[in-house]
A protein has these predicted regions:
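Conserved small/polar residues in nucleotide/adenosyl-binding loops
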Residues: 1-4
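Serine endopeptidase catalytic core focused on the charge-relay Asp
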Residues: 7-178, 182, 191-192, 200, ...
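Active-site rim segments in enzyme catalytic domains, especially the processed small/beta chain
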Residues: 185
């Protein structure tokens, strides 16, 4: 049970002249996305924030759970209609991977107790080059590397969620998803063996293309 105290200023009704308040309580929200990295016992994921579907504002959260979802199918993307990973989330103890502590414009962050196996060096903006790179995704049910192309590195004074323009070139992934689909946000991007960023957005009119955030941006957001 979560309790909180807030201050509300009542407004006088124009109809019956009584003081009233209006409340809108959102109990929880859920969705499927990708955990990007683990550093020690902390993690970062999504690469962008979780927003209220009705108001379009960034959700202020008390906390949350990182869970292992059940994936049923893949809906391929097409021009004008983003695809998606179709699945469900069961709130069972065995599905809990970690705890979400904060939801920011640059991703979700929290803690995770499990030790991870493979470690990557971090690639910073100056290390990134246009050309071949890879994304890590388990969209097929197994974690795999898929080839992509970094088409453009966007200047640092622009939208940090769109720091790189990327394009899926891997034939296997294109056959499976037709490009970037909802649920792949947060998928790690590797270049020259270094972790350089994460997928954030898909081009609505071209699902093969999308945007990515830099890893240095997510790490800074987690630590500050």
């Amino acid at each position: 049970c979560i309790r909180d105290r807030i201050k509300i200023k009542p407004e006088r009704s124009k109809t019956d002249h009584m003081y009233k308040i209006g409340t809108w309580i959102r109990d929880n929200t859920q969705g499927i996305g990708t955990m990007t990295y683990v550093k020690g016992t902390s993690f970062g994921g999504l690469g962008h924030g979780i927003y209220d579907m009705d108001t379009g504002t960034l959700l202020k959260i008390k906390g949350g759970l990182l869970l292992d979802p059940q994936i049923y199918s893949i809906k391929k993307g097409k021009s004008g209609t983003p695809g998606e990973i179709v699945g469900s989330i069961e709130y069972k103890e065995e599905n809990i991977l970690g705890s979400i502590k904060k939801n920011t414009e640059k991703g979700i962050y929290g803690t995770i107790p499990k030790k991870q196996q493979k470690a990557y060096k971090i690639g910073y903006r100056q290390d990134i080059k246009p050309g071949k790179a890879y994304i890590l995704s388990n969209v097929s049910g197994t974690m795999k590397q898929y080839e992509i192309q970094i088409n453009k590195i966007v200047p640092s004074d622009k939208d940090v969620l769109k720091s790189m323009e990327i394009e899926v070139t891997d034939k296997e992934l294109l056959k499976l998803t037709n490009g970037i689909i909802q649920g792949m946000s947060g998928s790690p991007i590797l270049q020259n063996g270094k972790l350089i960023g994460a997928v954030t957005h898909v081009f609505v009119n071209d699902p093969m293309k999308g945007y990515a955030i830099l890893m240095e941006t997510m790490l800074y957001e987690m630590e500050n």
